[in-house]
C-alpha cells in the first residue's frame, strides 16, 4: 500500500515542481517531449507486466505502474484541463490501488499454501463475496463506467484536443485500458473460475 501512496506523491511533486522551479519554455520542453514519452512507455510497460505477472502482489504493482503512466501523460500535456483531469484520476487511482492491495492481503491469507501465486488453488471461504469484491475493484481499476476511473480517463482524453500527439495519446490510453481488462480477467479467472 505504501507503493501506491509514494508513487502518487511523486506525481504530485512533479506537478508542483513544474510551476515553481522551471520557467515556461523549459517546462514545456521537458514536459511535452520527455515526460510524455516516459508516461506512454510506463503505461505500456505496466500493463504488459500485469499480463505476465505470476503473483497477485506483483500484478497489483504493475497495475499501479500503469496508472502512474496515465498520470504522467496527463501532466505532460501541459494544460490546465489535463492537470485537472490528472488530479481527479490521481485520487481515484490511489484509493482503488490501496483497496486492491488490501484485497490482495485478504486473498493471500485465504489461499493457504498457495498464498498470492496465480495458480489454480482450492476454493476459498466466502468465495462469492471475494469474487464480487474482485469484480468491483477490477471494474474500478480498469476505468469502466459507472465508476470514477472512467470519468478520469474521459477527462484526460478530452484534454488531448490541445496537444500535437493527440492520436498517439488516445490510442495508447485505449489500448492500455483494453489490455488492463484482459489482465484483470485472466487473474479473476485463475482466482475464482478455475478454483
Feature-to-residue mapping (PLM):
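Alpha-helical transmembrane segments of multi-pass membrane proteins predominantly involved
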Residues: 1-195
Amino acid at each position: 500500500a505504501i507503493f501506491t501512496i509514494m508513487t502518487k506523491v511523486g506525481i504530485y511533486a512533479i506537478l508542483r515542481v513544474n510551476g515553481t522551479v522551471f520557467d515556461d519554455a523549459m517546462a514545456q520542453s521537458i514536459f511535452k517531449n520527455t515526460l510524455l514519452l516516459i508516461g506512454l512507455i510506463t503505461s505500456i510497460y505496466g500493463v504488459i507486466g500485469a499480463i505476465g505477472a505470476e503473483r497477485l502482489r506483483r500484478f497489483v504493482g504493475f497495475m499501479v505502474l500503469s496508472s502512474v503512466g496515465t498520470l504522467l501523460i496527463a501532466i505532460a500535456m501541459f494544460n490546465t484541463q489535463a492537470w485537472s483531469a490528472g488530479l481527479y484520476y490521481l485520487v481515484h487511482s490511489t484509493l482503488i490501488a490501496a483497496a486492491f492491495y488490501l484485497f490482495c492481503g485478504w486473498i493471500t491469507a485465504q489461499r493457504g499454501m498457495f498464498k498470492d501465486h496465480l495458480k489454480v488453488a482450492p476454493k476459498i471461504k466466502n468465495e462469492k463475496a471475494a469474487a464480487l469484491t474482485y469484480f468491483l475493484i477490477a471494474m474500478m481499476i480498469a476505468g469502466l463506467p459507472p465508476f470514477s476511473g472512467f470519468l478520469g480517463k474521459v477527462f484526460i482524453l478530452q484534454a488531448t484536443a490541445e496537444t500535437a500527439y493527440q492520436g498517439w495519446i488516445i490510442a495508447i490510453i485505449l489500448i492500455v485500458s483494453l489490455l488492463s481488462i484482459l489482465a484483470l480477467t485472466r487473474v479473476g479467472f485463475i482466482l475464482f473460475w478455475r478454483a
